[in-house]
């Protein structure tokens, strides 16, 4: 049986892939993904929680939040437990795309369906990653432009 992941994570920290403050991520599927089909799962508005956290504790942007008593109690939940909504699956048709803020708490999920979940996943960092780490902007969208 399928179950929603208990917690997500933020990319860009030791043990979580690349070590950089991610600006944007993208997820798209090559096949339709139905509920329980291994979808990308995200915690709505968790990027705002993470932004507030790093504004309050800028010295923890390098991942030292994982060395705190709060981390020992809540793990990645420090970025998602207090959100306004429960996590959601990105259930979508082939070719649909979700662009997500780099501080959005997210996870993969188990595929209990007969159809494979095949997708493309991309992540981008700011060209001045070190500068972004030194100065967390007041607006979480400060470095974004369309």
Write out the residue ranges for each language-model feature:
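Low-complexity, flexible helical/coil segments
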Residues: 20-29, 44, 60-69, 76-79, ...
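Intrinsic-disorder/low-complexity, polar/charged segments enriched in Ser/Thr/Lys/Arg/Asp/Glu/Gln
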Residues: 23-25, 87, 97, 119
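Double-stranded beta-helix
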Residues: 33-105
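Non-heme Fe(II)/2-oxoglutarate
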Residues: 55-60, 94-99, 103-146
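A general structural signal for short secondary-structure junctions and capping/turn motifs
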Residues: 13-20, 32-33, 89-91, 96, ...
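Glycine-rich loops and low-complexity Gly/Arg-rich segments
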Residues: 15-19, 32, 50-55, 65-69, ...
């Amino acid at each position: 049986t399928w179950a929603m992941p208990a917690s997500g994570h933020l990319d860009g920290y030791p043990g979580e892939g690349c070590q950089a403050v991610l600006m944007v991520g993208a997820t798209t599927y090559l096949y339709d993904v139905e509920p329980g089909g291994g979808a990308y799962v995200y915690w709505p508005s968790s990027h705002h929680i993470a932004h507030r956290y790093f504004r309050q504790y800028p010295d923890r942007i390098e991942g030292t939040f994982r060395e705190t008593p709060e981390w020992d109690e809540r793990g990645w939940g420090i970025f998602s437990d207090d959100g306004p909504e429960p996590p959601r699956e990105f259930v979508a048709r082939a070719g649909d795309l979700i662009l997500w803020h780099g501080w959005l708490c997210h996870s993969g999920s188990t595929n209990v369906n007969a159809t494979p979940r095949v997708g493309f996943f991309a992540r981008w960092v700011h060209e001045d990653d070190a500068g972004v780490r030194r100065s967390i902007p007041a607006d979480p969208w400060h470095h974004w432009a369309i």
